[in-house]
Amino acid sequence: MKVQSLLRIETQLLLGRLLTRSGDQAWDFVVPFALLVIFPGKLQVAAFYYLIVKIGTFLLTPSSGKWIDTHPRIQVVKWGVWLQFFAILAGMVFFGMLDGLVRAGGRESWLLSVLFIALALSGVMASLGSQITDISVGNDLAPSLVAPEKLTHFNSWLRRIDLATEVGAPILAGALFAFHPEQLPLAGLFLIGLWNLVSFVPEYFLLRNVIQRSGLKIKVLTEAQSWKDTFHINLRGSFSDPIFWLILSYALLWLSVLSPHGVLLAAYLKDEMRLPETEIGLFRGLGAVFGLISTVSFPYLVRRLGLISSSRWHLGFQGVTLGIAVTAFAMGSTASVYVFLGCILLSRVGLYGFSNGEFELRQRLIPEGRRGELNSLSSLTTTSATLILFSAGSLLPQTEDFKYLVYVSLAAVLLANVVFIKWSSRQGVVTSGSENLYFQ
């Protein structure tokens, strides 16, 4: 009997998620270090690389959503996984060529720019493939295959995997990257790339097995389109859908710099607050730990209050804790700094809990034929918020002006509460199987 047949569908989906997330997190963690090995002292090179990746993903996201809706599940999974595979493989090749060119004294060569752009484009393709796979697994296969009464529990395990890989994969990747022969400084990068490539193979066969053996009916496809039509985006239609306001409430949270994992906040704590790196690192690690609490609190409140009410409580908790955090921040004393950081950590329970709720609401409410379109819209809005936030940060004349971003962040979270309450108050009751989820 094959090993795959011994695993439940939910377990196979979670295992696939673990494989792809661990590889993604490890690769993303070491790419800027590898760029700094090739271009020492040139932090702007790494920043420019990620800017290209973000903008490229932003531009291709709506089209990828339309493409998902017009193609069979097995084809979507195949393209998502193998697009990542060949993009990472290309990235390894371009890194090797860049390193060789620089070592040979070719810093002024036109080929250097060409190879860097090629490397960045491979990053765009890897990001796009990851996004396609995430939407396919989390937003299409999961709501189609997991029993409605088990969906909250399943999503909690998805979140645990995401948080575990967010913490664990960079630690392992950092250890691999640090140990290398003197003559081959990118050996760690290539090992991590190989780890990624190997992980894609079982991931693909797991997901293919899930689709083929689950008895899942053929996906309701929207009308097939030409490639030209796929790139013609009707955002007005997506924005007019009622689900947009749910998506917007979550996207507003991405306009916040009040995150343990935020690079802007970390820079401020180091430059203005003079906190040591060890304390900043501990703060970052505890952010994931507090996020794990939501994987227990959210399902508990769903059982007691319902999906919408649990989401409201968690989002409200984030607003209250950040309100206290910003008040402490405004005081400016040494003690208030730690109150500020402590409340940010507490707010992660609310943030991750609401994230679970918003994710499950999209799973339950978006019709099958529009899952690609509307879930890619969610990615589009969060990416837009990230670009807006970093653009605002780059315009700050002095580090001390970071305080304005802190106040804007609180306003964005409070606005998210207003938008979500207004949207959810119109939902009434959603029936899922034999269970009613009362949106109170």
Where does each model-flagged region fall?
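Juxtamembrane intracellular "pre-TM" segments in multi-pass secondary transporters
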Residues: 1-10, 209-250, 271-272, 438-440
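Primarily residues marking transmembrane-helix entry/exit sites
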Residues: 3-14, 43, 112-120, 226, ...
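Transmembrane alpha-helix termini and helix-breaking/packing motifs in multi-pass membrane transporters
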Residues: 32-39, 96-104, 167-195, 299-300, ...
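Multi-pass alpha-helical transporter architecture, strongest
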Residues: 60, 94-96, 195-208, 322-329, ...
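C-terminal ends and interior cores of transmembrane alpha-helices
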Residues: 82-112, 317-333
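C-terminal transmembrane helical hairpin of 12-TM major facilitator-type secondary transporters
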Residues: 309-354
